[in-house]
Amino acid sequence: MSLPAPDAPSIYDRLRRTDEELFALFISGKARRELSAVFGAAEYALLAQLARQAQRVKRQRAEAVYLLPGIMGTQLGSTRAAPTPDDLLWLDPQDVIGGGLERLRLPDSAGLRPLGAIPYSYLPLQLRLRAAGYRVIVHEYDWRCDLGEAARALAARLGEESAPSVAIIAHSMGGLIARRAMALAGSERVRCFIALGVPHYGSFGAVQAIRGTYPVVRRLAALDRLHDAEALATRVFSTFPSIHQLLPTRSLSPSADLFDGDQWPRSGPQPIAELLRGARSFTDELPACDARCIAICGTHQRTVVSIRLKDDDFHYEISDEGDGTVPLASAQPGECAKYYVRCEHSELPRSVSVARAIIELLRHGRTTRLAAQRGPALGRHVTVSDLELRSTWNEKIDWAALSPAAHRSYLNRLNQPPPHYAARRARKRQRH
């Protein structure tokens, strides 16, 4: 396998730009070849069109819109002196291949900082909002770290905002940061909070990330020549306070207190006791959503909806009641307004229909573009264990042998459910 020298900038390093610099590149057509290689020709054409539409807007609305990415949704890396590009670690596959994810480990990682939201995930929504006349501020943050600290940083930034009112659009874990920040001084001007697939009561994906059975962890391990999924889980992902703070609360997981390490399997990767204690405190103190919250919930995707411990292994119940990552029961809190869309978790901020609904919600406080009632559940329930999930994606990927299109597909589908989900569901249908 031919790889660049460790210090040689990759194509992902070279294209690590600020949002404004990226917009200018899409408008001008410069770096078209490299951008098309990373985004694909169709995505490049879409982003160029959206950037030109946003450029034509002459007058911005008075309200500021803060966009918060979800977990793993902010690029992380280290800055380098110009003209050398910044060293992008998350998510640069060349670094993953060489075992570089070890640099994410806490608390001993040094020199890493947020380097903007993942462009593929959040540029389309940002540009559509700009084209609608909104001033969009992307609030990047280190998604590994304590969410309470991230909330305080957001509240401080909101307190310095000059706009007369603020709207927050938060995807996934970013919504927990927003909820916490909205109870702190500095957030008084927040008029509305649009929650895109926010795991208000946690996600079982956090359990699987710690156990090394989460799709993202396993697919990254397939690229990593030095670590398997269990090693990545133990040495890297289980060191993040944020992942522990995403564990399901008792309202979502009544059969298991997942903040109690004694209720986890004794074998395999484990949570960290100190982080479990901090996570319990965070979730216990998280303020309830108020009337400013509007939830947009993805539905009808294969999602882990419950868990049980059996024979020293976790067994997960899977149904279509969720967005593939966040169970529907976790995405729709309290009495806030709720809307539903058949969409995968990672596609919520990319969806055209969701973006149009968000713009209507910002303007009018309601929308007709999404369903106000959830559709009927399909009634398909299967179970899968950690043991079964560990049989997936064990073969290493030769990244250099893949085409640019295969590179894009692999990175854009890191959270794709494992084959067991579809196979077991198909067998269940056959039995009926």
Where are these regions (language model features)?
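N-terminal non-catalytic accessory region
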Residues: 1-233, 237, 316, 322-328, ...
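Alpha/beta-hydrolase fold catalytic core
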Residues: 137, 145, 233, 240-315
